[in-house]
Amino acid sequence: MPEMANDPPFCGYSRPAHRLHAMNPAPPAPAATHTFVWHDYETFGADVRRDRPAQFAAIRTDAELNEIGEPVMAYCQPATDYLPDPDACLITGITPQECLAKGESEAAFAARIERLLAEPGTIGVGYNTLRFDDEVTRFLFWRNLIDPYAREWQNGCGRWDILDLVRATWALRPEGITWPERPDGGGPSFKLEHLTAANGLAHESAHDALSDVRATLALARLIRQKQPKLFDFCFALHRKDRVAQELGLPCAPAHARPFVHISGMFPTERGC
């Protein structure tokens, strides 16, 4: 989960301007049966197409964010024809030797993750997952002859990203959360370690996969506690049909409505 949180490329939330104060979303379906798998990768580089995973961690929770079962932690043995990025090893503290000693083959590693994320009703979620971790998963599955996309939509499964929820909370409902400033004074920092430190949330070791997962889950619980309607509204938008419904699609251009769009495409000084 490289920290691109201040200016990642795309995605966000839209909201009709005349409905900003009426967040009464229909409950996501199926509201009573889905579970979240909060997960994170540490990798041997930042290129999701070329670089390989080093470590994976995950925690499954119910819809109320209560943990289910034991956390998952796994290491992946690097391929013999692959050279890890030394800078990535310095950042994470994970070496190829450690992964060779503790890990399993990439095929077994991929199969384990696929079983976890493809369990019916699972919503895969994390911090910056849509732009990084999910891409790592897709290329990992592709290399190991697993359908890269099936776990994202089959059997009631889906995916979500807490980073966009954090942006929406700052822009629309900032009360109850302490928002740290970026070191350069350019606005709020959405880096996970900055947010956890500012809000007194445990984050023992940034760039350790399980520590990052627990920090992400703690931040999600805080937002859900302080802004429950916004949390439920944003979660509902992980489904394409709910997005289309919210946008009023399909509609003719003459009936299009103005929207407030919250996205990493826009700088924070513009309220996004």
Protein language model regions, located:
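Metal-dependent phosphoesterase signature
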Residues: 91-112, 116
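Extreme N-terminal basic, low-complexity initiation segments
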Residues: 2-8
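Acidic two-metal-ion nuclease catalytic site recognized across multiple nuclease folds
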Residues: 20-27, 221-272
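Metal-dependent phosphoesterase core characteristic of DEDDh/y 3'-5' exonuclease domains
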Residues: 34-35, 50-56, 60-92, 115-229
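Short acidic, Gly/Ser-rich segments with clustered Asp/Glu that frequently serve as metal-coordination loops
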Residues: 42-49
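Anionic ligand-binding catalytic core segments
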Residues: 24-29, 83-84, 101
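N-terminal phosphate-binding or glycine-rich loops at protein starts, especially the Walker A/P-loop
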Residues: 39-42, 58
